[in-house]
C-alpha cells in the first residue's frame, strides 16, 4: 500500500458538502491534509450578515471533525482585479461573461495554488466533479466527471498542464448522491447543507439590481429584425442571446402566438432585437470565432482537428471542426446551433477528455456575422 503520509494536499474548502467530502476522503487515504477557506468577496448584506462567516464556521466544524488543520485566506483584491473587473468589462461590451471559468483559472488554480505552495503543498484538491489521469510520461489528462449531470470540466477548461499537474479531484469518480451518502455516514456538519447555485458574488440578490450598482443601465428600443418597434428595453446588459423571459411582450404582438426571444443586440444604436420562435432564424448559426484558445496539454500552434464541443454548460456535445491559429480559432459546426453567445466559453472534448477551449467572440451564419453584440 502506498504511504501517502508524506504527501501534503491543501484542500480548497468552501463550507459545502463537496469540498468537505474531498477533505475527508484524502484524510482517509492517509494524505497530510490541510483545509483552506478562500474569502473572495465581501458579501455582507444590508443586515450585516456575511455568508462567508457562516461558511467558514462550517469549514471549521468539518475540519475539527476529521482532524485536519485549517486556515482562511483573503483573495478579495485578486478576485476583484482578475475576475470581477473582467465580468464588468464583458457586460460593458454587450457580452455575457462566464465568471466561473475565470475564477477557476485565476483564483482557485492560480492565487490559491500559489498560496498552497507556501504551505508546502505537493497538490491542491477541490470538490469539482472532474477527473485527472496521468500517463507514464507524466502528462496529465483532464477527463469528465463520472456523474454526467454534475461534470464541471466546462468550467475548468482554461486550466494549464502546469496547474493540472498539481491538482487532485477526489470526487471525480463519484456520483453526487454517493458524495451526500459519504457525508451523512461520516456525520459531517455539512451533510445536509444545500448546494450553492448561481454566480458566487451575486448569491441570492436580484441580478438586475446587483449589476446596476456597478454599470449604469441605458434604456433603449426593442425592435424586430424587420424594424417593428416592440417597446423599451431596460438596458442591453440585462439580456442574453436566446433569452425568453423578462421581455414584457407576451404573445399579443405576434400573429402565431409563439413566444418571443432575444435574437440580437446593436451596441452602437442601443437596440435590442427580438423575434418569435425558439428556432428563430436569427438565433441559428453555423460557425463561431473564439479567442483565448487554450489547451490542457501541449498542442501545435496551428492545426485543424475534429472533436465535440459545448457552447454552454449543461448542453449535449455537438460535432465540430476546429481551425486553430495561435490563441484564436474558427469552430465550424456539423449542424446549425442555436443562440451562440459572445462571452461564453466554447469547450472541446475528445470522448471523455476535456481538451481545453476558448471564449466566444462572434457567431456566423453562412459567413455573415450574427448581430449579437
UniProtKB/Swiss-Prot annotation:
A Gene Ontology BP annotation from the UniProt entry: tRNA wobble position uridine thiolation
Residue span of region Interaction with tRNA: 150-152, 312-313
The protein's name: tRNA-specific 2-thiouridylase MnmA
GO cellular component: cytoplasm
Positions of the record's site feature: Interaction with tRNA: 128, 344
Principal location class: cytoplasm
Family, similarity comment: Belongs to the MnmA/TRMU family.
Gene: mnmA
Secretion signal, residue range per the UniProt entry: none
Localization per record: Cytoplasm
Residues of the active site: 103, 200
First-tier enzyme category under EC: transferase
Top-level taxon in the UniProt lineage: Bacteria
Job description of the protein: Catalyzes the 2-thiolation of uridine at the wobble position (U34) of tRNA, leading to the formation of s(2)U34.
Keywords: ATP-binding, Cytoplasm, Disulfide bond, Nucleotide-binding, RNA-binding, Transferase, tRNA processing, tRNA-binding
Taxonomic placement: Bacteria, Bacillati, Bacillota, Bacilli, Lactobacillales
Amino acid at each position: 500500500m502506498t504511504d501517502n503520509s508524506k504527501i501534503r494536499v491543501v484542500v480548497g474548502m468552501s463550507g459545502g458538502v463537496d469540498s468537505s467530502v474531498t477533505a475527508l476522503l484524502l484524510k482517509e487515504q492517509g494524505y497530510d491534509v490541510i483545509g483552506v477557506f478562500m474569502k473572495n468577496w465581501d458579501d455582507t448584506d444590508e443586515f450585516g450578515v456575511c455568508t462567508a462567516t457562516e461558511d467558514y464556521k462550517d469549514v471549521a466544524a468539518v475540519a475539527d471533525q476529521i482532524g485536519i488543520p485549517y486556515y482562511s485566506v483573503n483573495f478579495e483584491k485578486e478576485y476583484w482585479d482578475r475576475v470581477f473587473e473582467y465580468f464588468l468589462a464583458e457586460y460593458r461590451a454587450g457580452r455575457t461573461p462566464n465568471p466561473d471559468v475565470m475564477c477557476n483559472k485565476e483564483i482557485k488554480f492560480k492565487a490559491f495554488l500559489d498560496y498552497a505552495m507556501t504551505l508546502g503543498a505537493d497538490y491542491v484538491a477541490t470538490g469539482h466533479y472532474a477527473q485527472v489521469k496521468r500517463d507514464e510520461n507524466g502528462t496529465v489528462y483532464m477527463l469528465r466527471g463520472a456523474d454526467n449531470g454534475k461534470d464541471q470540466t466546462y468550467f475548468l477548461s482554461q486550466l494549464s498542464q502546469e496547474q493540472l499537474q498539481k491538482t487532485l479531484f477526489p470526487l471525480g469518480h463519484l456520483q453526487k448522491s454517493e458524495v451526500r451518502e459519504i457525508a451523512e455516514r461520516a456525520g459531517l456538519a455539512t451533510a445536509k447543507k444545500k448546494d450553492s447555485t448561481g454566480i458566487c458574488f451575486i448569491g441570492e440578490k436580484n441580478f438586475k439590481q446587483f449589476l446596476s450598482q456597478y454599470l449604469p443601465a441605458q434604456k433603449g428600443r426593442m425592435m424586430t429584425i424587420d424594424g417593428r418597434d416592440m417597446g423599451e428595453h431596460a438596458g442591453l446588459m440585462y439580456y442574453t442571446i436566446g433569452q425568453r423571459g423578462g421581455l414584457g411582450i407576451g404573445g399579443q404582438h405576434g400573429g402565431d402566438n409563439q413566444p418571443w426571444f432575444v435574437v440580437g443586440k446593436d451596441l452602437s444604436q442601443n437596440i435590442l432585437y427580438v423575434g418569435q420562435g425558439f428556432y428563430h432564424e436569427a438565433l441559428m448559426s453555423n460557425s463561431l470565432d473564439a479567442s483565448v484558445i487554450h489547451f490542457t496539454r501541449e498542442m501545435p500552434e496551428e492545426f485543424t482537428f475534429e472533436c465535440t464541443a459545448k457552447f454552454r454548460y449543461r448542453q449535449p456535445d455537438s460535432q465540430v471542426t476546429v481551425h486553430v491559429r495561435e490563441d484564436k480559432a474558427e469552430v465550424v459546426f456539423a449542424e446549425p446551433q442555436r443562440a451562440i453567445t459572445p462571452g461564453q466559453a466554447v469547450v472541446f472534448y475528445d470522448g471523455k477528455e476535456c481538451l481545453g477551449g476558448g471564449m466566444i467572440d462572434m457567431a456566423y451564419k453562412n459567413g455573415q456575422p450574427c448581430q449579437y453584440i
